[in-house]
Amino acid sequence: MPSQVLLCPPTYFEVRDRKNPYMRVPVDPELAQQQWERLCAALHAAGLQVNLIDPVQDLEDMVFAANQVFVGSHKQIGKFVVPSEMRFPSRQKEVPHYVDWFATRGYNVIALELRGEYLEGGGDLLWHPDRSRVWAGYGIRSSEGGLKRFASAMAHMQIPVTSLHLVDEYFYHLDTCLSPLNAEAAIFYPGAFSSQAQEELKGGWKRLYPIDREEALGFACNGIAVDGRYITSRLTPSLESALRQEQLDPLVVDVSEFEKSGGSVFCMKTFLD
């Protein structure tokens, strides 16, 4: 189970342009700060050590800490990060700040030669909870070529990567439509995936709990399962049923100001281990 997370304060957070279909409404900065502080408190209550990276002016999306790197560990090289190549230039400017944060704390940096391909970190690259593989989404933000280069790098460490084609622009990252609950179970929105990707998911989990489109648009899949709890921005009927069956207690934290920018609880942090 992860023990630490990294977050970025929302000092400069705003909806400045439209990078996804959710980005239509201005943000209330004061309310966003309050919601962010409550999320930090919830993560701490769940037993996680909360670490912070300094926000940078004019990097309004830096608060979404899941995207700038992929974090992993390997018995031979120890903890490592793979820097992202973000599809939007404004978000690419965030990446060096995160890479520096990890490098100064002893993480090995595995820089890929992406050559015009895209790879969006922990938004599209999700560890299976037992670390047996990485689930990798592509098609909206990360490109298929970017995932192939990532998979090649992981193969050198005997880490399998399973690619999943995303087909709905509202579910632009994998973490918006797939949420691992434990090593055997996950919730997902089937409509976000190609038919082949749905088959891959069915073969990789003992129990898959589907949710409907309305629930998925409310970010039901963008929660965090940790320490017997599921931290989420809202509790929907399908989600509540799945959590009950997996013996997870819901912990609801309102992050609606951040959802105006297309990200919820999971998007706002990255695990450090």
Give names to the regions the model predicted:
Residues 1-273:
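The feature marks the mature, well-folded catalytic cores of soluble enzymes
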